[in-house]
Swiss-Prot record:
<dbReference type="Pfam" id="PF05667">
    <property type="entry name" value="CCDC22_CC"/>
</dbReference>
<feature type="coiled-coil region">
    <location>
        <begin position="308"/>
        <end position="471"/>
    </location>
</feature>
<protein>
    <recommendedName>
        <fullName>Coiled-coil domain-containing protein 22 homolog</fullName>
    </recommendedName>
</protein>
<feature type="coiled-coil region">
    <location>
        <begin position="529"/>
        <end position="570"/>
    </location>
</feature>
<dbReference type="Pfam" id="PF21674">
    <property type="entry name" value="CCDC22_N"/>
</dbReference>
<feature type="region of interest" description="Disordered">
    <location>
        <begin position="234"/>
        <end position="280"/>
    </location>
</feature>
<keyword id="KW-0175">Coiled coil</keyword>
<comment type="similarity">
    <text>Belongs to the CCDC22 family.</text>
</comment>
<feature type="compositionally biased region" description="Low complexity">
    <location>
        <begin position="265"/>
        <end position="276"/>
    </location>
</feature>
<dbReference type="InterPro" id="IPR048349">
    <property type="entry name" value="CCDC22_N"/>
</dbReference>
<dbReference type="GO" id="GO:0097602">
    <property type="term" value="F:cullin family protein binding"/>
</dbReference>
<feature type="compositionally biased region" description="Polar residues">
    <location>
        <begin position="248"/>
        <end position="257"/>
    </location>
</feature>
<feature type="region of interest" description="Disordered">
    <location>
        <begin position="110"/>
        <end position="129"/>
    </location>
</feature>
<dbReference type="GO" id="GO:2000060">
    <property type="term" value="P:positive regulation of ubiquitin-dependent protein catabolic process"/>
</dbReference>
<dbReference type="InterPro" id="IPR008530">
    <property type="entry name" value="CCDC22"/>
</dbReference>
<dbReference type="InterPro" id="IPR048348">
    <property type="entry name" value="CCDC22_CC"/>
</dbReference>
Amino acid sequence: MDEVDKIIMHQLHQIDASIEPTEELANFTPALVVRAVASCLQEISQSLKDLPRSLPMAMAQRFNVATILAERCQESGYRGDIGYQTFLYPNPVELRRLLMFLIEQLPRERQSEDDANRTSHPLSSREQLERQIRQKLKAQLKMPWVPQFCRMVANRKSLGCNSQCISFEPQLNLNVPSANPEDRSKEVQQYFDQQAPNLFQQTSANCYDLIASVMHKNDLERWGDLPSMDPVTLTSTSDDLVGKALPTSPTQTSTTAEKAAQDNSSEATATSTTTTPLELLGQEVQELRTQTEIMLNHRKMVTSKLNELKIRETTASQEKETIESKLKSHEKLSLVLSEPEENVGKLEALVEATENKRQTLNQQWQDYRRPLLDTLSTLRNAQEAQQVQIIRNSIEKLEQEIIAKSQQHNELNSSLKNATQSVAPRQEYTRRIHEFIKNIRKQREDIFKVLDDTRQLQKQLNVVNAQLQRQFNYTDDLLFQSAKHDLHAKKAYKLLAQLHSNCSELVECVSLTGNVTKEIRDLEVQIDGEKLKNVLSRLQQITGDIQRSEQHIQELQTQIRQVENAITVG
């Protein structure tokens, strides 16, 4: 049940954050049970928003709250045994059953309701992003699964494209292993098993069509020795194919005938050569490889030159910055040296102006500083005086407390002296304690003596009972054997059986009387204990309270009657 409890606690924590998920159902208090059940009921039905979520202090109100929650659970469809005791005295098994039912009744569209509630106020960027992610996930979960080789067609149809404009372009370099595994080496087989992409991955890389690619590969394997022909473009639509198959004018028929003758002549010349399409493709691939190598080498050279030019550019820019800074300084010096007397006068005037400005600022600062220093000194003096006054007050309080404590100490000393004089001496106490101990020991010895006597008596009774039983069995056997032949022995046997039954009845009566006397003594002890509890006085107090409450009720009734009479008269 631990996993079930964890699930229940997780759901309750999502509904009400005040319920910790680390709690256990066995440790649920009545207040926590009421809060959890009320939260679940409010989530189930929006009309139950006024349900109490906590238990009041009064016992009557507690019963009312528990009965209301029990009725609401029954109205929700709970068929188990539920009442106020389920909430006030919770049982883990019943509580687990109730919470599981309420969690199953929770609405599944709580998230959509939260989204609808959020539209009433502007959403932040984070909330908008979370909402978009949630909507995207919902849409993806509702979409049906489509195989990998059909996803391109499905995506184009979802965009509104017609099936006639779909391009069935084949993958020309489809890599398919041979059907016979003996034709492949161990390395090739390992490559196809672990690293080689499958047909779906090869065709889905660049939007190739799977069926067209497989048919193209099959044609290459079957008709690879035939001469190459101009392939018909598979991307043409059905209207174009119909237009090509049905010419509209005789000029077109003549041109098509001329083209057919040229094609036949080219086919005748092609049959004379022995080159196959695969060899031509190999040659083209080789030429392309050489061209790519040349282009790569050229690219490396160009990149190296570009890096060198960038380095030169950075160095030139740095040199330019240094030269510009030096040039500015030289220009300033040249301006100063061009008219030395005038510039020196200007500098002296500037120095004098700055000195005058500094003096004025210093004077202003001193004028502003003096009142601040005065206020600071006054505040410090006031603070010190306040602290001194606080210390003096605390000293006076401590002196008063010391005087009061000393007086109390003197009073206690005097009371202690008087108590020691009035109380009995220590020897009297020890004598009384020894007497109590002697009495206790004497009582203990008497109790042990009574117990020993009862044990001895019990042993004697058991021995006598065993002897009587043996004697009865022996006499019973003798009389039974002689009763077969003698009438007097038969009568004696009957009298013996009657005597045995009477004796057993007497023993039972004695044991019953003993039990009754024991119960009587126990009841007497209980009665004495109840007498010590002053039950009569308590009953009298309760009856007095009842009489006072009745009098109060009668007074209220008379007041109500007077008010009614006043209303009727008025």
